[in-house]
């Protein structure tokens, strides 16, 4: 059995889980060693360069290796299901952890506004990136897996263009475009705080 044949369709779920676990482990190692992804990477004009690079490189790899089982795996349903489940666990599970849950109570006791309270947290939770999960390496790698899956699935259907594929193409390309633009635009988002006096 060769390495290429081990990616056969009957093993797609198994390889999908292995790939996502590998991405999570690499992401966690990077998160604890390097820290979070700098916000400047997704600010203008770097987001344009990143977006164009992703589209050109992934499209080039797809066209060069479109008949390989690994490309079929990355653009297939098993990989999509695994990556969506893991992304859902990351966003709902880790995103619902509130590190500031005691701040309002402590602020009420001291008679100050919650935003004026000092934040003391477990340094490991901060290093894990729970204050801003979208800037963590492990989230970025899993999200990149979802973008690659949607892009490869769209390209696969676009090759054999038929009228019945139009809804599939619009649906998958639209979802890919929303996710892609949302991530690349997050570096330029500004959060402003306005205090109103009565």
What are these regions (language model features)?
Residues 1-198:
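Solvent-exposed, non-transmembrane regions of integral membrane proteins
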């Amino acid at each position: 059995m060769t390495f290429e044949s081990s990616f056969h369709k009957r093993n797609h779920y198994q390889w999908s889980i292995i790939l996502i676990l590998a991405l999570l482990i690499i992401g966690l190692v990077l998160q604890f060693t390097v820290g979070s992804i700098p916000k400047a990477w997704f600010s203008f004009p770097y987001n344009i360069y990143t977006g164009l690079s992703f589209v050109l490189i992934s499209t080039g790899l797809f066209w060069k290796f479109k008949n390989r089982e690994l490309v079929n795996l990355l653009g297939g349903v098993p990989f999509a299901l695994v990556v969506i489940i893991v992304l859902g666990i990351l966003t709902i599970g880790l995103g619902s952890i509130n590190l500031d849950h005691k701040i309002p109570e402590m602020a009420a006791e001291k008679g100050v506004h919650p935003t004026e309270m000092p934040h003391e947290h477990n340094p490991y939770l901060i290093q894990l990136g729970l204050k801003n999960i979208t800037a963590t390496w492990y989230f970025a790698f899993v999200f990149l897996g979802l973008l690659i899956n949607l892009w490869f699935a769209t390209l696969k259907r676009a090759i054999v263009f038929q009228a019945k594929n139009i809804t599939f193409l619009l649906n998958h390309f639209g979802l890919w475009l929303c996710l892609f633009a949302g991530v690349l635009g997050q570096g330029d988002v500004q959060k402003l705080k306005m205090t109103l006096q009565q």
